[in-house]
Curated annotation (Swiss-Prot):
Compositionally skewed regions (Pro residues) per UniProt: 336-370
Gene encoding the protein: Samui
This protein's name: BAG domain-containing protein Samui
PROSITE patterns named in the record: BAG
Organism name: Bombyx mori (Silk moth)
One annotated GO molecular function: adenyl-nucleotide exchange factor activity
Amino acid sequence: MESPVVLDKPPEYHGDRGFPFEEEEGSGAWSELAARHPDIAARLRQRPATWARKRRPSSNDATDDFGDNFSGFDRFPFDDIPPEFREHFPSHWNRRFSSRDEQPQQQTPASPTQPQQQTTATQTEQTPTHSEHEQQTQIPQYGLRNTVDLGQKSPADPSLVDADDRTHRSMSAPPDTPNQTKMSVHNHQEQTHQPHGETQSNVRHIPIFVEGRDKPVINKSVDHGTHFGEAKPQYVPPPPPPHVDRDQYFADDVNFHPPPNFSRSFGTPFNKTYRQGPQPFVQQKAYPQTAFARGASPQRSQSPKPTDEHFVKVPVHHETPKAEPPSRAQKSPQQHQPPPPKSPQQHQPPPPKSPQQQPPPQREQTPPQPKTQQPSSNDPITQILSIQTDVLNLMTDVENFTGTKKDKRYLFLDEMLTRNLIKLDNIETDGKENIRQARKEAIKCIQKCIAVLEAKADSSNQQRKAQPEQETQVQDECQSHDVDMKENTQNDQTTEIPAQPIVENGEVEMDEATKEKPAEPQTAAAVPPQTDNTEEANVEKQAVESAVAVEKDEKQEVVKVEAQEKSEEVKPEDANASGTVNPAETQPPAADTRPEDNKSTGGDAEKKEDKKSTPKKVTKTVKKRDKSKDKKDAPKDSNKEDKIEANSVLNPEPMPVDEKGDKTDSQVMDVDGAASQ
């Protein structure tokens, strides 16, 4: 996280040491003015006080000029000012210069700090690496965390556009720039714990104010004691709270060159990224800082001297252990190049090292890219192989498929095949012929599978449509056959029904009926031989007809027996009435009728034998009916005997009895009576 740093106390410079512009604008300018124009010098003695009063409230607006800068940073070394001017300094000047530990931070100008803001990030970020190099290489000049080699900066850096004249001055003067002043506070806080080194060092610590913290962030691992003397522990005042506001103000301006409006408008998005930690290096690659960083690394090896701008963009980085090892390896040879006596140059090496730290993460990021490309180059082939295996598995299902397009199985297979097609479409060939050929073959295979599946579904649909047609045809044929069968059975019934009255019309007709009966079933059996139903119907009909015939024969026999009994009873009565003539008269007709009776009885016997042979199948019905008829006959016989005892004429009596039964019996009775008479 990057935040501006307010310096507690700028160093006092004696002789050659001082800010690059102090020689011209600072001590040299005052001395010349005092020598040439003493009256103007007296007038100028009061100007800094007025400037300080006027400019202090506006210093927060980053619009302070050099007048306020000199008063705020106390950049006028008293050694360079003639003593006559010191005597005439205003009282508030004396207070300000005497209490350097208290107020210099409140008077920090904006114009020099803006370029400083660009240097702080890399300086603070690289401190652990340089401190470790101090301990390893034991070259204290180059292990400073705040050393900045400003000769490495390219004109592409926006911070250099406004400071061309300063770069020329820095070529000749030691780098006692705001970089050094900002670093002062941070180093002063650690001077007590550090060993003695060069007392003339200009290195200063930079207290970095982080949001959410009350104290500035200080890298305690940095050992800068070799570069500082013990004569300056008094310059370590605690940072006053108003600096937090100024830090927050500068936090928006950290990334860009001095113009405050430009820094405010474009600095905020980068400050957000800096506050997140090690991200600034990755996110600043698109900006000219990286361009000058890459161009700066070769210049670092060529010109280790502080010949360029002192203001460098430095993204503050609190977590830099990952970037340290490559930076150490790269910077260790470079740190040995500049000679040790150049203590002021100790501030300048780090900025080119900050760009050198930026390429290592890039190098770390570039090797994973070919790693990702290698599996990606293998991915298309593996994907095509997996798709082909799936298609082969689906092909077996397609071959076994027998349903229609409405079946779920068909929908499933079609969906899976189309998904595999889509997968093949998403595969990139990357201009490789083998991948193209494999994809084409896989697509052709899937298309064939889909065609086979559709063909099978269509064929099964046609088969299912054909089957209902065949079934309807068969049903129609069966229905026509059934109609024919019904008609045949009805015709058979109509032909058989008139045969029954013929059988009922006398004994002679009974013979004809019996002779016709065996023929009729034969014809009936011959006419409808098509199905078994007709045969069964014929068998049933034959059984019913035989049963009816047996009943009729039994009735006829019973009637004949009754007629014979009546005739026998009538004959003695006639004999008693007519004498002998009646028996004689009765005998011849009896003799005449006997042969007929015998014939008829013989025919009846044959009929009975034939009928008994046929109705053996229906013995149950015959027995039941015989029993019932015997019961009916028993009262008839008893009534007839009663009537005979009463000597009544019995001939008309059996007629009504027979009328209750069948008409055929009455006719038979008449015939028998005529024959008996």
